[in-house]
C-alpha cells in the first residue's frame, strides 16, 4: 500500500464513520435485542463474532511477519498490545457469550470489511509507512509511551469487567433483556465500548 492509498483510505474511513453515526439515528442495527428477520440470512452469534473479528488479528500478524522492522522494540510492543486486544475479541470473547442469539450475515460481512481495513491501515503505517526513525527504542523511555500502556490495560480491564457484567445479567433460561447497572455502566451507557475506547488511546 502506498502513501496515497493510505491517505485515501484514511479519509474514506473517516467519512464512513460520520455516515454510520448519522444513519444509526434512523436505523436500528439488527443484532442483539434489535435482531429481526428483515436483515435476512443470519449466522450463529459466536461464529459471526469470530469470522468478523479474526481478520484484523490475522492481517496485522501477516503484515508484522513480513516487515523488516518486526523485531524493533517499539513496533514489536505496539504489535503485541494490538494482537492481545484482538486475540481476546476474536477467540476468547465469543466463546464466553451466553444465549443463542444470531447475527445478520450482512452485519457480519460489514464487520469483516471494516476489520480488514483496520488491520491493513494500522499495520501498513506501523511497519511500512511510518517515517524512518519515528518508532525508535528511545520511544520506550518516554512518559507518553508508558502512560499509553497504563491506559491500555486500564481500558482492557474496564472492557473485560463490563463484558462480565453483561454475561451475568440473566439467569439460565431467562431470555429477557436487562440494562446493566454495575461497574462502568453506572457512569456510561456502554461500559464495554468505553473500555475499548480507552484501550485505543494507548499510542
Model regions and ranges:
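Interfacial segments of alpha-helical transmembrane regions
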Residues: 78, 104-113, 139-152
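Transmembrane alpha-helical segments that form the membrane-embedded catalytic/substrate-channel core
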Residues: 17-30, 85-95, 116-125, 150-169
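Membrane-interface helix termini and inter-helical loops of multi-pass transporters
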Residues: 68-70, 127-139
Amino acid at each position: 500500500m502506498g502513501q496515497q492509498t493510505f491517505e485515501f483510505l484514511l479519509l474514506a474511513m473517516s467519512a464512513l464513520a460520520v455516515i454510520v453515526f448519522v444513519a444509526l439515528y434512523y436505523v436500528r442495527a439488527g443484532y442483539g435485542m434489535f435482531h429481526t428477520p428483515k436483515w435476512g440470512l443470519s449466522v450463529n452469534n459466536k461464529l459471526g463474532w469470530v469470522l468478523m473479528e479474526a481478520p484484523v488479528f490475522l492481517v496485522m500478524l501477516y503484515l508484522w511477519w513480513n516487515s523488516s522492522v518486526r523485531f524493533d522494540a517499539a513496533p514489536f510492543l505496539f504489535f503485541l498490545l494490538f494482537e492481545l486486544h484482538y486475540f481476546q475479541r476474536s477467540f476468547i470473547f465469543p466463546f464466553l457469550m451466553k444465549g443463542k442469539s444470531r447475527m445478520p450475515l450482512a452485519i457480519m460481512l460489514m464487520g469483516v470489511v471494516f476489520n480488514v481495513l483496520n488491520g491493513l491501515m494500522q499495520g501498513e503505517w506501523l511497519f511500512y509507512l511510518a517515517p524512518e526513525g519515528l518508532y525508535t527504542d528511545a520511544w520506550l523511555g518516554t512518559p507518553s509511551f508508558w502512560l499509553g500502556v497504563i491506559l491500555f490495560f486500564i481500558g482492557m480491564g474496564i472492557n473485560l469487567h463490563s463484558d462480565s457484567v453483561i454475561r451475568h445479567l440473566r439467569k439460565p433460561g431467562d431470555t429477557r433483556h436487562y440494562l446493566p447497572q454495575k461497574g462502568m455502566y453506572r457512569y456510561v451507557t456502554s461500559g464495554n465500548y468505553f473500555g475499548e475506547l480507552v484501550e485505543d488511546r494507548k499510542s
